[in-house]
Amino acid sequence: MASSETQPRFGQSVKGLLSDKVTSCSGDVIALTRQVLKGSRSQELLSQAARNMVIQEDAILHSEDSLRKMSIITTHLQYQQEAIQKNVEHSKNLQDQLRHLMK
């Protein structure tokens, strides 16, 4: 009878250990799933960051091109300003000459 009493206890302890192991494995599977999802999310974030970086690079290149064009326009405006100033001085000289002739 002693052996029949130990058998149910042994069977129960094996079932208990098995149940504990299943619970532990389930927890590990859940943790692994969370890590995989985190990794997947990290990959998505990295991909989005790379796309944003490309967009920013295009914007920077466009801005650089615009600045180059504005620099050229500024140079042309300076030439025009100098030409206008020379013409104003020349017209003042002509006005002085006309006044002198009218006297």
Swiss-Prot record:
GO cellular component: BORC complex; lysosomal membrane
Claim: Membrane is one of the keywords in the record: yes
Subcellular location: Lysosome membrane
InterPro entries: BORCS7
Assigned keywords, A-Z: Lysosome, Membrane
Top-level taxon: Eukaryota
PANTHER family linked: BLOC-1-RELATED COMPLEX SUBUNIT 7, BLOC-1-RELATED COMPLEX SUBUNIT 7 BORSC7
Function: As part of a BORC-like complex may play a role in lysosomes movement and localization at the cell periphery. Associated with the cytosolic face of lysosomes, this complex may couple lysosomes to microtubule plus-end-directed kinesin motor.
Record-stated family: Belongs to the BORCS7 family.
Protein name (Swiss-Prot/TrEMBL): BLOC-1-related complex subunit 7
Organism, scientific name: Danio rerio (Zebrafish)
Top-level taxonomy: Eukaryota, Metazoa, Chordata, Craniata, Vertebrata
Gene that specifies this protein: borcs7
